[in-house]
Curated annotation (Swiss-Prot):
Its job: This cephalomyotropic peptide stimulates contractile activity of cockroach protodeum (hindgut).
One GO cellular component term: extracellular region
Keyword Ligase: no
Secreted as UniProt keyword: yes
Transmembrane segments: none
GO biological process, one term: neuropeptide signaling pathway
Subcellular localization: Secreted
UniProt KW keywords: Amidation, Neuropeptide, Secreted
Protein name: Leucokinin-3
Species per Swiss-Prot/TrEMBL record: Rhyparobia maderae
Residues recorded with modification Glycine amide: G8
Length: 8
């Protein structure tokens, strides 16, 4: 998770 996406 990169922080802005909740699926990554």
């Amino acid at each position: 998770d990169q922080g802005f996406n909740s699926w990554g």
